[in-house]
Design a protein with these regions (language model features):
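Hydrophobic alpha-helical segments, chiefly the membrane-spanning helices
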Residues: 270-271
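Short, conserved charged micro-motifs
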Residues: 29-30, 65-67, 117-123, 208-210, ...
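Short beta-strand/strand-turn micro-motif
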Residues: 4-8, 95-99, 112, 177-250, ...
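Extended, compositionally biased flexible segments
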Residues: 1-18, 22-41
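Conserved small/polar residues in nucleotide/adenosyl-binding loops
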Residues: 260-266
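Short cationic amphipathic helices and targeting signals
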Residues: 8-13, 17-25, 55-59, 103-114, ...
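Glycine-rich, acidic
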Residues: 38-39, 44-189, 193, 201
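Glycine-centered loop/turn motifs
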Residues: 28, 79-87, 208-214, 251
């Protein structure tokens, strides 16, 4: 175990001996195989996939909590249902696991529903949000919002080639505790970072950055763009990139080279 980032997932304790593990669609098989490999041999823990039986609805925005309260008897007040909490109850007539988490950077809830009750849950959500002008949003919108917030995307900004400290996740790692890959990670910490994940403010108002584009400093390639999107609320052309530690200082001037061979000057700030 090399000490690098292995997966990205949401884990929730359901308080009845079950742990909910929600990962990216693209990593389902990878994560299932890795988890199965590390199950205790005595069979005391079982691993079940809910991919084919459940679907997730995302309710996000400043009115999300009020809309959620309209369609459930669960107490959705901030005091009873705070950030990073999970509750089980009904959405309309549909049984649901509801998590107070967000990938958009706004107040948001994940509503996990069994597929045979999905339509009922969706109708309850639409009815509860109608008076507030609630509408659908797509992946490009959430990509823009999560980049403004500084949230990282699996297999884009979070990849198995780099460790948590290089990926900006060091504050979540407790090196004084034992875990799989700890020895390898400690060796990499001692050796120093190979690359560092940084955020870029691209000084161009007509062309976005491109994931995979090279990042240069003084004519030398120093890194690669991992994600890019226009931040509509902050009015900035945003990107994330892994760059050499020497080029990872706030205010460093770098250049992102797009696939169309345009050069996009950047003014960098750490995310």
């Amino acid at each position: 175990h090399h000490g690098n980032v292995k997966a990205e997932a949401t884990l929730a304790n359901l308080d009845d001996g079950r742990v909910w593990y929600g990962s990216a669609v693209a990593s389902e098989i990878h994560d299932m195989e890795w988890l199965a490999e590390h199950l205790p041999a005595d069979g005391s823990i079982r691993l079940n996939s809910l991919t084919n039986t459940h679907t997730t609805l995302i309710l996000a925005g400043p009115k999300a909590r009020a809309i959620l309260q309209k369609m459930t008897r669960i107490n959705c007040s901030p005091e009873a249902f705070g950030w990073l909490q999970v509750l089980q109850g009904f959405v309309g007539i549909a049984p649901a696991v509801i998590m107070s988490v967000s990938f958009s950077g706004e107040q948001a809830f994940e509503i996990h529903l069994p597929n045979n009750q999905l339509h009922a849950g969706y109708l309850a959500l639409c009815q509860a949000g109608e008076a507030s002008g609630m509408g659908l949003f797509g992946s490009m919108a959430i990509e823009s919002m999560r980049m403004e917030k500084g949230y990282l995307h699996w297999k884009a900004d979070l990849i198995t080639e780099f460790n948590p400290f290089e990926s900006g996740l060091g504050r979540f790692v407790q090196m004084d505790k034992d875990f799989i890959g700890r020895t390898a990670l400690q060796q990499m910490i001692t050796a120093g970072p190979r690359k560092l994940l940084v955020s870029l403010d691209i000084a161009c108002d007509h062309a976005p950055g491109h994931p995979g584009a090279s990042v240069c400093a003084d004519g030398d390639v120093v890194g690669t763009v991992t994600s890019a999107a226009w931040g509509h609320r902050v009015g900035k052309n945003l990107a994330y990139a892994f760059v050499d530690p020497a080029a990872a200082h706030i205010g460093d001037e770098l250049t992102a080279v797009s696939y169309t061979h345009l050069t996009l000057p950047t003014s960098r700030s750490v995310g």
